[in-house]
C-alpha cells in the first residue's frame, strides 16, 4: 500500500505540474536528443512525444494491461520516447541521465503493478513497441532466432511457425506479453518441465548501458549476461534484443482439460496432483486452477486442470491411468493437434481448426481488467486437511483464485545460481489471482483484501526465510524502494524474496555496471552503499 499511497500523492503533483515545467523538460530533452542523434524534426515528432502530442495518450494507454493504472488520477510521464532505431535508445538514455530524469522501460506492458509506466517522481517512458523485428534461422545449430525486446511472444511463435511446424520456443502462453520483460525476468510456459526456463535458451543479447553504449554478450562480459537472465533487464540497461535457441517438438501434441467439483472428488485430485505433476514425464505439464464460485453462485471451489503433453493422446491416457487415476482422464477428454494450435487452445479457443495462427500477431487485448497478482513457491505437499481448509476459505472469497504450476523435470538438473533466477528446485509455483470489473477504491480494497487473505492462509505451506516470489509476477506488497540513503536495505527486503542468494551477485553486477543507479524503479536491484564498495 506504501507505493499506492505515493502514486496517489504523486498524482496530485503530476496534475499540478505547471505547463511551463512540462515544456521546459520537453525542450531540454529535445535539445539534448537532437545533439546526440541526427534525427529530423519530422521524425522527432513521432519519436519524442510530449503530453501535448495527439499521440501521447493513445501510446501510453496502448500497453497498459492493468486497468488500475489506466485512470486519470494516475501519474503520467512527462515524455514518451518511442524509438525506431538503436541510436534513439542510446540518446534516450544519455539525455535522461544528463537531465536527471527517471527512465521507465516498457516492452509489452504486462508489469502487474505498473512499474514500467507509473512512478511517484517525474519520469519518462521508453516504449519499445517498435522494436519487434524477429529473424529465425533454422540452419543455426538446431535453430535460433534474434528477437527484439518489443516483440510479443505471440509474434515470436508465429515467425517460428512460418518456418517450421516442429520448432518451438519455451516461453509463456499469453501471446501479448512482451519479450523484454518476460525473458529478462526468467520466463516460463507449458514446456517448462521439458525444456526449462525461457532464459535457459538465451545465448546472446544486445544492451544499452548507463553510458549509452551498446554491448553484445562478448563486450558486456559474463556477469552482466548472467544478470539479465532472470534478474530483470531494467535494473542494468535497456536490452534491445535476445538471441535464443529453438527447441524441437513432435508434429502431434496432446492437450486436455478436466474440471471437477468438490462432490466429484476435486480435493483428492488436487492432493494427488502434488505428487504426480512435478515427477511425471517431463513432456507433460498439468496446470491446476482453483477459483472461488463467482460465476456459478455455488458454495464450492471451481477446480480445473489444463495440460499439454508432447506426444500422442493414447500414451498420456495410459500414463495417467497408471500414475494419476484420481484424474479420471479419458481419451475423449484429449485433443491432438500441432504445437502452434496448442497455443491457440491455451488462449481458450476450443475449436482450434477454426482459428488461424495470425491471431498470435494481435498485440492488444480486447480490454484491460482490474487485477492484482502475488506468487509463492511450494516445497512440500499440503495434506488433505490443509487443502480442505484452503478450499473452504476460497469458496467465501469473491473472484479470487490460485494457479498451480508444476516444476520438476529439467528444472531439477540446473543449479540455482546458473542464472539469476533461483527458484528451480521446487514442487510447484502458485500465482495468487484476483480480477474484477469495476473501478473505484472500494472495489479495489475488497478484492485485493480477498487476495491477501488467501496469501496469508498459505503462509504455513510455502517457502520460508525468505518467502520467495517470482519477479515476473510483480508484487509491490513485498517491498518498495525510493533509492535514498537506505536504498540497499530496502532493496534487500524484496530482493531476497525474488532472487534468494543470487541477490548478492546481482547487487555486485549492478554496482559495477551502473554505479550511479540510473536504471531504477521501485523494485530494481540497488547498488552497494558507498562504505561497502
Swiss-Prot record:
The family database entries (PROSITE patterns) matched by this protein are listed as: FAD_PCMH
One of the entry's Gene Ontology molecular-function terms is:
FAD binding
Indicate which residues are glycosylated according to the record: 35, 70, 133, 296, 412, 417
InterPro entries the record matches: BBE, FAD-bd_PCMH, FAD-bd_PCMH-like_sf, FAD-bd_PCMH_sub1, FAD-bd_PCMH_sub2, Oxid_FAD_bind_N
Kindly list any coiled-coil regions of this protein: none
The known PTMs are summarized as:
The FAD cofactor is bound via a bicovalent 6-S-cysteinyl, 8alpha-N1-histidyl FAD linkage.
Per the UniProt entry, the disulfide pairs are: 32-95
Cellular location(s): Secreted, Cell wall
Q: Keyword set for this entry?
A: Cell wall, Disulfide bond, FAD, Flavoprotein, Glycoprotein, Nucleotide-binding, Oxidoreductase, Secreted, Signal
Q: Which PANTHER family match?
A: OS08G0158400 PROTEIN
Q: How is this protein named in the record?
A: Berberine bridge enzyme-like 12
Origin species, per record, is Arabidopsis thaliana (Mouse-ear cress)
Amino acid at each position: 500500500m506504501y507505493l499506492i499511497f505515493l502514486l496517489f500523492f504523486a498524482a496530485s503533483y503530476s496534475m499540478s505540474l505547471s505547463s511551463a515545467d512540462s515544456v521546459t523538460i520537453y525542450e531540454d530533452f529535445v535539445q539534448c536528443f537532437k545533439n546526440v542523434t541526427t534525427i529530423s524534426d519530422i521524425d522527432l515528432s513521432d519519436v519524442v512525444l510530449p503530453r501535448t502530442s495527439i499521440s501521447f495518450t493513445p501510446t501510453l494507454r496502448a500497453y497498459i494491461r492493468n486497468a488500475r493504472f489506466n485512470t486519470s488520477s494516475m501519474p503520467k510521464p512527462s515524455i514518451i520516447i518511442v524509438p525506431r532505431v538503436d541510436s534513439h535508445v542510446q540518446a534516450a538514455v544519455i539525455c535522461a541521465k544528463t537531465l536527471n530524469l527517471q527512465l521507465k522501460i516498457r516492452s509489452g506492458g504486462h508489469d502487474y503493478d505498473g512499474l514500467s509506466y507509473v512512478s511517484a517522481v517525474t519520469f519518462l517512458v521508453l516504449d519499445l513497441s517498435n522494436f519487434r523485428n524477429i529473424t529465425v534461422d533454422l540452419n543455426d545449430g538446431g535453430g535460433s532466432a534474434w528477437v527484439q525486446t518489443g516483440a510479443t511472444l505471440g509474434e515470436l511463435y508465429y515467425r517460428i511457425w512460418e518456418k517450421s511446424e516442429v520448432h518451438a520456443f519455451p516461453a509463456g502462453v499469453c501471446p501479448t506479453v512482451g519479450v523484454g520483460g518476460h525473458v529478462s525476468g526468467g520466463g516460463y510456459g507449458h514446456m517448462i518441465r521439458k525444456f526449462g526456463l525461457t532464459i535457459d535458451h538465451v545465448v546472446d543479447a544486445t544492451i544499452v548501458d548507463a553510458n549509452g553504449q551498446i554491448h553484445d554478450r562478448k563486450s558486456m562480459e559474463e556477469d552482466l549476461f548472467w544478470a539479465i537472465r532472470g534478474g530483470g533487464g531494467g535494473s542494468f540497461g535497456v536490452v534491445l534484443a535476445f538471441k535464443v535457441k529453438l527447441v524441437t517438438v513432435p508434429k502431434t501434441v496432446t492437450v486436455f482439460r478436466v474440471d471437477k467439483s468438490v462432490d466429484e472428488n476435486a480435493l483428492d485430485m488436487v492432493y494427488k496432483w502434488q505428487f504426480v505433476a512435478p515427477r511425471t514425464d517431463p513432456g507433460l505439464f498439468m496446470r491446476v486452477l482453483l477459483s472461488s464460485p463467482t460465476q456459478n453462485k455455488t458454495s464450492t471451489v471451481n477446480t480445473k486442470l489444463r495440460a499439454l503433453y508432447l506426444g500422442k493422446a493414447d500414451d498420456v491416457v495410459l500414463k495417467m491411468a497408471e500414475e494419476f487415476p484420481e484424474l479420471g482422464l479419458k481419451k475423449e477428454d484429449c485433443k491432438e493437434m500441432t504445437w502452434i494450435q496448442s497455443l491457440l487452445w491455451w488462449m481458450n479457443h476450443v475449436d482450434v481448426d477454426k482459428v488461424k495462427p495470425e491471431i498470435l500477431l494481435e498485440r492488444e487485448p480486447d480490454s484491460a481488467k482490474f487485477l492484482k497478482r502475488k506468487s509463492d513457491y511450494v516445497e512440500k505437499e499440503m495434506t488433505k486437511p490443509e487443502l480442505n481448509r484452503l478450499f473452504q476459505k476460497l469458496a467465501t472469497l469473491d473472484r479470487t483464485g490460485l494457479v498451480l504450476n508444476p516444476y520438476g523435470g529439467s528444472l531439477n538438473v540446473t543449479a540455482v545460481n546458473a542464472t539469476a533466477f533461483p527458484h528451480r528446485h521446487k514442487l510447484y509455483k502458485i500465482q495468487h489471482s484476483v480480477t474484477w470489473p469495476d473501478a473505484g477504491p472500494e472495489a479495489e480494497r475488497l478484492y485485493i483484501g480477498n487476495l491477501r487473505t488467501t496469501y496469508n492462509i498459505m503462509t504455513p505451506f510455502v517457502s520460508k526465510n525468505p518467502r520467495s516470489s517470482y519477479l515476473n509476477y510483480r508484487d509491490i506488497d513485498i517491498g518498495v524502494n525510493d533509492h535514498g540513503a537506505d536504498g540497499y536495505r530496502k532493496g534487500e527486503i524484496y530482493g531476497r524474496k525474488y532472487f534468494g542468494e543470487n541477490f548478492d551477485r546481482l547487487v555486485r553486477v549492478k554496482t559495477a555496471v551502473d554505479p550511479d543507479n540510473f536504471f531504477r524503479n521501485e523494485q530494481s536491484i540497488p547498488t552497494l552503499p558507498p562504505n561497502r564498495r
